[in-house]
A protein has these predicted regions:
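Bacterial N-terminal signal peptides that target proteins for export
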Residues: 1-6
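Bacterial N-terminal signal peptides
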Residues: 7-15
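Short, structural beta-strand-to-alpha-helix junction motif
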Residues: 31-32, 87
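Conserved hydrophobic/aromatic "anchor" residues
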Residues: 24, 36-39, 94
Length: 195
């Protein structure tokens, strides 16, 4: 039994949260810009990236001035996109504010690959560990091009390929296929912090 719910947060790009209705106690989606904004409004918190710029990997780590959780690519982004450019200590502060904690690496892996729900949908089997966070196939595992599958929109989801108005980057949270334990974006989108 977990002492505190898990806060799923990403490194320079960010995820977070915990819910009782997902077997491993992790929220279904990454922490959004909107959710992180609530934390900032309540606490007056300021991130390092707001002062010094965000880090991106372009054949090596590069600092991008004005890139931060509010402006992931130097421009304002919608509140349903994942909060990014968050350091480990900032992720810990956010989790603590929510009464949560970062998952241990093995907890994150188990949540993303081993079905733990008591009554999962027919496409999943309780106790089974899958090769991909979406099950037996990488299709829908949150690759920008659907991991090579056809690019038709997923039923009930926005056409997130068109939504990436920058032409690159991450998708809004929860726009991809629901995977193991009903979680989204465990196959990519942004990097998560774990202990």
């Amino acid at each position: 039994m977990l002492s505190r719910p898990l806060c799923l947060i990403i490194s320079l790009i960010f995820v977070a949260s915990a819910r009782a209705d997902t077997a491993p106690g992790i929220d279904q989606t990454e922490v959004t810009i909107g959710a992180f904004a609530e934390f900032v409004a309540a606490t007056g918190f300021r991130t390092k990236a707001e002062d010094a710029g965000g880090m991106v990997y372009e054949a090596g780590w590069v600092v991008k001035p004005d890139w931060n959780w509010r402006h992931p690519y130097g421009i304002a982004s919608p509140p349903d996109e994942p909060a990014v450019h968050i350091t480990f200590d900032e992720a810990m502060a956010y989790c603590d504010w929510r009464g949560q904690r970062l998952p241990h690496r093995d907890e994150w892996i188990r949540a993303g690959y081993t079905e733990l729900r008591p009554d999962p949908p027919a496409s999943f089997q309780r106790g089974m560990t899958y090769e991909f966070p979406t099950g037996n196939s990488p299709e829908g595992a949150n690759c920008l091009a659907e991991c090579g599958a056809d690019l038709r929109p997923i039923a009930g989801k926005r056409d997130y390929g068109r939504y990436l108005y920058r032409g690159f980057g991450h998708a809004p949270v929860g726009q991809t296929k629901s995977g193991v334990n009903g979680l989204f974006d465990m196959g990519a989108n942004v990097w998560e912090w774990a202990v």
